Regions:
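N-terminal leader/targeting segments and the first structural element of proteins
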Residues: 1-31
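Extracellular beta-strand scaffolds
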Residues: 27-28, 44-45, 60, 68
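Hydrophobic residues embedded in beta-strands of well-ordered beta-sheets
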Residues: 19-21, 37, 53
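Long terminal segments
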Residues: 1-9, 50-119
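Tandem-repeat architecture and repeat-register "anchor" residues
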Residues: 6, 24, 40-41, 56
Length: 119
């Protein structure tokens, strides 16, 4: 599964439908836990529902081919780059508590691209 930003640029992918999210350069950047997206530093980054990754304010950060339901208009998708060899995953830090879910927004988040995973 590929995660595209608000411009249709492929930023990251879910490795073999596992819980781990990688950038195309091979860097592991996050993982899914239930319906939440966490950084390896333990920070709760956002939510993954219906093919959308949303920030903590409910705004859309990424979409996938499977995105359904409410959200902003999806742009045309750019071609996916080749996937580089995956780097070793860092150890997961203790997860911070999940934030309360915000109402689902219909616009794009101001946080996008790789920056989302660096929080």
């Amino acid at each position: 599964m590929t995660f595209y930003d608000s411009h249709g640029i492929p930023i990251a992918y879910l490795y073999d439908n596992s819980e781990y999210i990688y950038l195309f350069n091979g860097k592991p950047v996050a993982y899914l836990y239930d319906d939440a997206v966490y950084g390896f530093n333990g920070h709760h980054l956002g939510w993954f529902e219906n093919g959308w990754i949303r920030d903590l304010h409910g705004q859309c950060v990424f979409f996938t081919e499977e995105s359904t339901g409410s959200g902003p208009a999806k742009p045309a998708k750019h071609a996916k780059p080749a996937k580089c060899a995956r780097n070793a995953r860092p150890a997961k830090s203790a997860r911070n508590a999940k934030h309360a879910k915000a109402a689902k927004g219909l616009s794009w988040s101001s946080i996008s691209g790789e920056v989302f995973f660096e929080q």
